Amino acid sequence: MNALAATNRNFRQAARILGLDSKLEKSLLIPFREIKVECTIPKDDGTLVSYVGFRVQHDNARGPMKGGIRYHPEVDLDEVNALAQLMTWKTAVADIPYGGAKGGIGCKPKDLSKSELERLTRVFTQKIHDLIGINTDVPAPDMGTNAQTMAWILDEYSKFHGHSPAIVTGKPIDLGGSLGREAATGRGVVYATEALLAEYGKNIKDLTFAIQGFGNVGAWAAKLIHERGGKVIAVSDITGAVKNPNGLDIPALLNHKEATGKLIDFSGGDVMNSDEVLTHECDVLIPCALGGVLNRENADNVKAKFIIEAANHPTDPEADEILCKKGIVILPDIYANAGGVTVSYFEWVQNIQGFMWDEEKVNRELRKYMTKAFHNLKNMCQSHNCSLRMGAFTLGVNRVARATTLRGWEA
């Protein structure tokens, strides 16, 4: 089952739990707008090449649409649609005043020079600039994009609309980015993990962790878990994987990766197969990379007691069923990785106010939002006797449905 089918399935289950009428259910499922554009750029050698870009604006009942832009060769309309819908429910679960959107370009960033990436980003912005806006649709970084990408979008958009720092979040600090934004998703994952573990009388410092994916989110999660006394015993990324039953020295591993660009050959751990991280003996598994990594082929072999979904849609529905039957507690993506969009909201607020927060305030507010969201999620689960995943979807869908009804859009 692909990401869009799985997301639609979860939405329909939540709609049934809430007793939504069919007209409102259909209205919430259909995207507000789907944008598909062709972006043709000259390469550095003078040849022309075209890429297809997408922006799906799913829902704006609760506020401006919000979601990242990813550069990846497998980007397609179905994937972007699924991720846009997930953003609608995620922002509602976090209780920030946004709707959901997502964008992407089907390209391989590592095959493009910096100047080619800049040209591609600027052409994409030219194609969609009149369909995004500070109070309409606010992009952010995602897989394959970063603060520099956002700087190019900001600059290109400002050529048409004047200086508009709030048009994107995840920007460089010098252009109005927020302190704490780089670590926000990983930090939010740790706050979410702490909230969940507290319900079971457990603490990070007493547990072992396996982290699949060691990019921005995985690296920050590992660093913060290590600082709290947790034992990170296995880590993987696209270059390989390392393990140490006594706990990896995360600061040393981060330095090693920065110096070499890879995890293997790290002297403080043994090499392991990357796929084995998902089934490694540990207390807490944190998938931080691509979707669909937990599936019917490997779900039976997962040994973790808790799974924290730092990635988007890392668990397919078949695996979800298997894992739940095994008694594994899964903290769903639309709550667990909401730290990034929450601090994006803080950045947007700072830009609109023209008043910057210090990092301590950003982190304090993030903890407050993540903790409050967990308790709202827990209460929804108790009210409807459902899993954490369905509790999160029900919480998000209910908030969007209420806003839609109040606006009179369901008629």
Swiss-Prot record:
Q: State the Gene Ontology terms under molecular function.
A: glutamate dehydrogenase (NAD+) activity; glutamate dehydrogenase (NADP+) activity
Q: Which reaction does it catalyse?
A: L-glutamate + NAD(+) + H2O = 2-oxoglutarate + NH4(+) + NADH + H(+); L-glutamate + NADP(+) + H2O = 2-oxoglutarate + NH4(+) + NADPH + H(+)
GO cellular component annotations of the record = mitochondrion
- Ranges in a coiled coil: none
Which keywords annotate this record?
A: NAD, Oxidoreductase
Q: Where along the chain is the active site annotated? A: K102
Gene name, please?
A: GDHA
Instruction: State which Enzyme Commission number(s) the record gives.
Output: 1.4.1.3
> Which source organism does the UniProt entry give?
Nicotiana plumbaginifolia (Leadwort-leaved tobacco)
Q: Which GO terms describe its biological process?
A: glutamate catabolic process
Q: So which domain of life are we looking at?
A: Eukaryota
Name the record gives this protein: Glutamate dehydrogenase A
Pfam families per the UniProt record, alphabetical: ELFV_dehydrog, ELFV_dehydrog_N
Homology family: Belongs to the Glu/Leu/Phe/Val dehydrogenases family.
Q: Which InterPro entries match?
A: Aminoacid_DH-like_N_sf, Glu/Leu/Phe/Val/Trp_DH, Glu/Leu/Phe/Val/Trp_DH_C, Glu/Leu/Phe/Val/Trp_DH_dimer, Glu_DH, NAD(P)-bd_dom_sf, NAD_bind_Glu_DH
State the disulfide connectivity: none
